[in-house]
Structure formats: C-alpha cells, structure tokens
C-alpha cells in the first residue's frame, strides 16, 4: 500500500492552454513569450496584436483559449487574469532537401514548437520583497 496523497487546499489555482504544433523555432518564440509574462491578459493580447512577428497570431490564439478556459471552466473574472507563465519547448523537426549544383542536396530544417500559457488571477499571485 502506498501513501495517501496530501491535498493542498491553499494551492494556487491556475488555468493553462497548450498549443502543440507551432511552425516556428524555440529561438524565435522565447523573446516574445518573455515579453508577456506578468502582464494582464488584455495588455498581453494588445502587445501581441501590434507586434510585427508572424508567430504572434498563434500565441494570441493560445492566450484567448486560456482565457476561455478560465471563464467557462473555472468562472474566473477575466479582467483580473494575468499571464503567470509562458514557455515553449521543442517538437519535431521536418527535414527537407533542396537540390543544389552538380547533383548535391542541401538539407532544410523546419522546426516545430509547443507553447504553454499559464494564467492566474491577479489577487492570487504572491508579491515578492519586503515592501508592501
């Protein structure tokens, strides 16, 4: 017999949304995701909307999905939601070949990534530091 799981009632409730197949590399996604962490959801969506990067459309959709999850599944107030975490990971890399001179071929790598967005309510995030 195993130990019983301890249930922490004070655990911070979060909402997450995962987009598993984004056609971009992790290197291009990371700076965008770092820019939205800690912001309110509407501010993050606005910042992504006015960004010139192609991939921000997919990130915006993922945030909108997380907001819908928070509103419909957990009845959170969407005005109080902030982006608690946003990170990405490597997925598959499609390998293609481009014909070159004298019968040679050059590889083309087409990377895919997964994006995870975690939202939390503003009053549930603990502040750090000694000043109030």
Predicted region positions:
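Ribosome large-subunit tunnel/peptidyl-transferase-proximal elements
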Residues: 2-87, 114-122, 126-132
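Short beta-strand/turn micro-motifs at beta-sheet edges
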Residues: 19, 104-106
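A generic structural micro-feature
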Residues: 75-77, 98, 107-112
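A short, conserved strand-capping beta-turn/loop at the end of a beta strand
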Residues: 87-100
């Amino acid at each position: 017999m195993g130990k019983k799981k301890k249930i922490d009632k004070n655990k911070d409730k979060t909402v997450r949304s995962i987009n598993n197949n984004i056609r971009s590399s992790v290197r291009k996604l990371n700076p965008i995701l770092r820019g939205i962490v800690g912001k309110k959801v509407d501010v993050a969506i606005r910042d992504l909307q006015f960004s010139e990067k192609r991939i921000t459309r997919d990130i915006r959709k993922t945030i909108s999905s997380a907001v819908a999850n928070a509103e419909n599944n957990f009845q959170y107030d969407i005005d109080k939601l902030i982006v608690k975490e946003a990170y990405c990971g490597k997925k598959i890399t499609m390998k293609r070949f481009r014909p070159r001179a004298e019968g040679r071929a050059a590889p083309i790598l087409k990377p895919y990534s997964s994006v995870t967005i975690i939202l939390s309510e503003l009053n549930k995030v603990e502040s750090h530091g000694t000043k109030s």
